[in-house]
Regions:
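N-terminal helix-turn-helix DNA-binding module of bacterial transcription factors
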Residues: 1-63, 76
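Bacterial carbohydrate/catabolite-sensing allosteric modules
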Residues: 45, 86-91, 112-115, 140-148, ...
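Amphipathic helical "hinge" segments at domain boundaries
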Residues: 46-121, 190-192, 202-206, 210, ...
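Short beta->alpha connector loops
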Residues: 101-104, 127-131
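Active-site-adjacent beta->alpha loops and helix N-cap segments on the catalytic face
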Residues: 130-140
């Protein structure tokens, strides 16, 4: 196997300096377009590939953003990734996608890997088990922008993009009450009750009941697994109620 082409090979072929080749490859404003095109064509001909990590270390930018989600096979997170990429790609950025599978240790490993890759920013949705905030503080200490999506931590210096889950749950429950419903089930996911968005939804549901003088019934809170079988079990449980519910508040 032949050695990889270098900027010196390009320089030798074009009879110019390696410094000129480097400036052309990095789109230096003082390099003519004619030289840039010539260098790029020769680089392609010789099979030259830039060392992106070395370039990132030199320039301080990698033009990559790390995106961490619990699972990419969940439609909600898939749509988030698609939206992020649609916004970043036209601006010259690429994304590195990581999954945690709601495992805090894997979350830490992902963050360390992204920081080592010199990403220009990290967008993340925390795991249901996230307790140690020090890894996120490390991101901020390195002056790497941090954005939480959907699930978040309240950290100074970090940004977040979330929905008002309390209001959404309240309005959904109120709508059912306005339709005459009084026994309304609420589904929540096993192991996620401490995650902010799920707590907010339960509180919104509970507040709507309270505001309409409907007593809270713990039996109507259904804890399910976060998969299709969990949904099937919930449906069967609803059908098996002796005093069957007349309204159901679900979410994906």
């Amino acid at each position: 196997m032949s050695d990889k082409a270098t900027i010196y090979d390009i320089a030798k072929k074009l009879n110019i300096s390696a410094a000129t080749v480097s400036r052309a490859l990095n789109d230096h404003p003082k390099t003519s377009n004619k030289t840039k095109i010539l260098v790029q064509e020769t680089a392609l001909e010789l099979g030259y590939e830039q060392n992106k990590l070395a370039l990132a270390l030199k320039s301080g930018r990698s033009n990559t953003i790390g995106v961490i989600v619990p699972r990419i096979d969940i439609n909600f997170f898939g749509s988030i990734i698609r939206g992020i990429e649609d916004e970043l790609y036209p601006k010259g950025y690429h994304i590195i996608i990581c999954q945690t599978h709601d495992n805090e240790q894997k979350e830490i490993q992902n963050i360390n890997a992204l920081l080592n890759a010199q990403v220009d920013g990290i967008i993340t949705s925390i795991t249901k088990n996230t307790k140690d905030v020090s890894i996120f503080e490390r991101i901020l200490d390195k002056n790497t922008p941090l954005i939480f999506v959907d699930r978040k931590l309240n950290l100074k210096g970090a940004s977040s993009v979330t929905l008002d889950d309390f209001k959404g749950a309240y309005q959904a429950t109120q709508h059912l009450i306005d339709q005459g419903c009084k026994r309304i089930t609420h589904l929540t996911v096993i192991g996620y009750q401490s995650v902010g968005i799920y707590k907010d939804r339960l509180e919104g549901y509970t507040q709507a009941l309270k505001d309409n003088d409907i007593p809270f019934d713990a039996d109507l809170i259904l804890d399910i697994e976060n998969d299709i079988n969990g949904g099937k079990k919930a449906g069967q449980k609803i059908l098996n109620f002796k005093d069957r519910p007349d309204g159901n508040f679900f979410f994906e």
